């Protein structure tokens, strides 16, 4: 897939900006706070309908305006696609594909596949379990857009079950109805099992790819292990055991859940452990080792999405390339070549190896305006 054109209207600090992409690599250069990351964020929104920077649409609409619009022309193997997203300060959204309004936003997902790599991704290693769960889920949505619906179902049941437990925890609350709790347990186990199984299946395909890239980048000096520990214990070779095991663990934790007013079993408590040569990378990995690990994960994402979707996704590198040493830059360049369209932001071109600049489209960004560099 290839992003040909992006058009921003009243988005962030852009009033009206159209960008034509004319090369496999586009480098956006300029000082901080000029709008480089905003442009990548617009592409992210068209892919995922989410921003990793903010949660409210009003923060995406230019100050003083009531709505903004992000549109793009994308070339897929099946033909051209026009994608449009209208954001309103009041939170209402409209999405369309080829000028046809899409009623369910979830049906908009899957038209534009991306892999993002920014300095925030170091939290994959350094952050808590929630960071790694969010990463798993984001990759899964790229591979299987229906997963967004399955995850939403689980989160809704979890929220309602927590509210039920919390309500009956109060001293003056009526006694908890065991039959009602059984119904909530069944719903949580059914939707949660689907989430766990998909996470497990995806990692089975991603782990070998990440291991290959990690060995290559580290010069075969380090061994990467990725351990997925579902909160519900079961043998992945026997997936039919997961649902009854889920219910069993809910029964075991029932009294504790009622005391705490909180669901203590389910994929919202899964963990992913990243090990380098058998040692937890979070506590003991050096900064260089952690960067190598995250780069290996991102390259694995690229390859896996390409395998599953059948087309190469876009790669968004947000102010991260200058943080990679020459070896890691070259490994990344060798991996993407010209097959993966890449959008790169940077404050200066001096940190780039000459090979990155060859045949790249270089755009200058200043105060919400994009100019072609000569």
From Swiss-Prot:
Give the source's domain of life in one word.
Answer: Bacteria
Record's InterPro entries?
Answer: DNA-binding_RecF, DNA-binding_RecF_CS, P-loop_NTPase, RecF/RecN/SMC_N, RecF_2
**GO BP annotation list:** DNA replication; DNA synthesis involved in DNA repair; double-strand break repair; SOS response
Q: Which GO MF terms are attached to this record?
A: ATP binding; single-stranded DNA binding
Q: Where does ATP bind?
A: 30-37
**Annotated CDD domains:** ABC_RecF
Q: Name a single GO cellular component.
A: cytoplasm
Q: Which Pfam families match?
A: SMC_N (PF02463)
Main subcellular localization, coarse class? Answer: cytoplasm
Give the record's keywords alphabetically.
Answer: ATP-binding, Cytoplasm, DNA damage, DNA repair, DNA replication, DNA-binding, Nucleotide-binding, SOS response
NCBIfam families noted in UniProt: recf
The record's function comment reads: The RecF protein is involved in DNA metabolism; it is required for DNA replication and normal SOS inducibility. RecF binds preferentially to single-stranded, linear DNA. It also seems to bind ATP.
Put simply, this protein is called: DNA replication and repair protein RecF
Gene encoding this polypeptide? recF
């Amino acid at each position: 897939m290839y992003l040909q054109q992006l058009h921003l209207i009243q988005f962030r600090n852009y009033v009206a900006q159209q960008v034509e992409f004319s090369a496999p690599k586009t480098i956006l250069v300029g000082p901080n706070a000029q709008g480089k990351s905003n442009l990548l964020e617009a592409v992210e929104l068209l892919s995922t309908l989410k921003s990793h920077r903010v949660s409210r649409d009003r923060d995406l609409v230019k100050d003083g305006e009531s709505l903004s619009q992000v549109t793009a022309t994308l070339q897929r193997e099946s033909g051209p696609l026009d994608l449009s997203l209208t954001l309103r300060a009041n939170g209402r959204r409209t999405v369309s594909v080829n000028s046809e309004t899409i009623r369910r936003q979830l049906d908009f997902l899957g038209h534009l596949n991306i892999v993002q790599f920014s300095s925030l991704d170091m939290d994959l290693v350094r952050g808590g379990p929630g960071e790694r769960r969010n990463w798993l889920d984001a990759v899964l949505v790229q591979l299987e857009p229906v997963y967004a619906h399955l995850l939403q179902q689980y989160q809704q049941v979890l929220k309602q079950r927590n509210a039920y437990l919390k309500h009956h925890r109060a001293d003056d609350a009526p006694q908890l109805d065991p039959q009602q709790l059984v119904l909530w347990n069944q719903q949580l186990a059914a939707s949660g099992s689907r989430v766990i199984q998909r996470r497990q299946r995806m990692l089975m395909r991603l782990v070998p790819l990440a291991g290959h890239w990690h060995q290559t980048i580290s010069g075969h000096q380090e061994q990467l292990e990725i351990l997925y520990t579902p909160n519900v214990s079961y043998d992945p070779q026997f997936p039919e055991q997961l649902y009854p095991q889920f219910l069993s663990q809910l029964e075991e934790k029932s009294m504790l859940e009622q005391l705490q007013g909180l669901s203590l079993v389910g994929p919202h408590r899964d963990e992913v452990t990243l090990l380098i040569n058998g040692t937890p990378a979070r506590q003991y990995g050096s900064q260089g080792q952690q960067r190598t690990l995250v780069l290996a994960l991102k390259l694995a994402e690229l390859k896996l999405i390409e395998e599953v979707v059948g087309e190469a996704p876009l790669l968004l590198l947000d102010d991260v390339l200058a943080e990679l040493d020459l070896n890691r830059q070259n490994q990344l360049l060798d991996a993407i070549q010209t097959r993966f369209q890449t959008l790169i932001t940077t404050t200066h071109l001096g940190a780039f190896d000459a090979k990155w600049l060859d045949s790249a489209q270089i755009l200058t960004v200043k105060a919400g305006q994009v100019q072609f560099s000569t």
